[in-house]
Amino acid sequence: MPTATNDGVAIHYEVDGPTDGEPVVLIEGLGYGRWMWRWQRERLADEYRLLLPDNRGTGDSDVPEGPYTMAAMAGDVDAVLADAGVEAAHLVGASMGGMIAQQYALDYDRAATLTLLCTSHGGEESVPIPEETAATILEVPEGYDERETIRHRMEPAVSDGFYDANPDLVESIVDWRLAGDATEAGRNAQAAAVQAFDVGDRVSKIDQPTLVLHGSADRVVPVENGRLLAEKLPDGDLEIVEDGPHLFFIEDPDHVADRIREHLFANPIEAATDAGAGGGD
């Protein structure tokens, strides 16, 4: 597996798809490993050159002492692109990954487009995680083993009935999470970056074509955050996924992949770079 280095931190990443495809970076959410993108990977790797980095603290990447910052994790993405020899790429980020993508677009100049799923620009204007969801994540029933704890904490991120309808898939997800998610220390360090993230007064400087996808039934990052984000983006396109939970891209992967393809097809990298898209201010 290729490895990039940012300020002494090793960031491992996978590459999939044709070498001549337009590069697409799939950026993980808080604590989640590369498994979270397996559905989009299956649907996009026929056409696009996919880069899937493990965030610092996650999977095969280093776990430096926290707290982390979104700026440092955006730097990790740039290190991956530099290591892979990529001058311009489409960035797709979910939840914390969407925050990293926003930070990247503000700090660096390789982002041609953004696709931001179930995310927020942070800060006081953003709508916080509901208290009930926070309690579910933090208050694990006594006696739960590691697998039961993962299922319990993930429940607010999926639709009601998802567990009952997909028992085998849920068990596979638990397996993947045990194998590739962040360590506890890494997750806590990432959570500190999310807590401190606030680009509400700068997000209007992101001029790349940006698709914002958000589930209307998101119990982790309420849908109002997607609306606020899209309103501030100069070239933002918002789609609310009706009844979609936080992990709507797992539950309805075909629709999400179709929307990503449409967005990337409408905004090819050559056109974006010719227009001078990019932050780095």
Protein language model regions, located:
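Conserved alpha/beta-hydrolase catalytic His-Asp/Glu region
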Residues: 125, 146-195, 200-202
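Flexible "cap/lid" loop of the alpha/beta hydrolase fold
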Residues: 106, 113-144, 186
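Conserved acidic catalytic loop of the alpha/beta-hydrolase fold
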Residues: 74-89
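Conserved HGGG/HGGXW glycine-rich cap/lid loop of the alpha/beta-hydrolase fold
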Residues: 5-66, 70
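Conserved alpha/beta-hydrolase "acid-adjacent" motif
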Residues: 219-225
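Gly/Ala-rich beta-loop-alpha elbow adjacent to hydrolase catalytic centers
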Residues: 93, 97, 101
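Catalytic active-site module of serine/aspartate enzymes centered on a nucleophile-bearing elbow/loop
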Residues: 236-281
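Short beta-strand/loop motif that positions the catalytic acidic residue
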Residues: 206, 212-214, 218
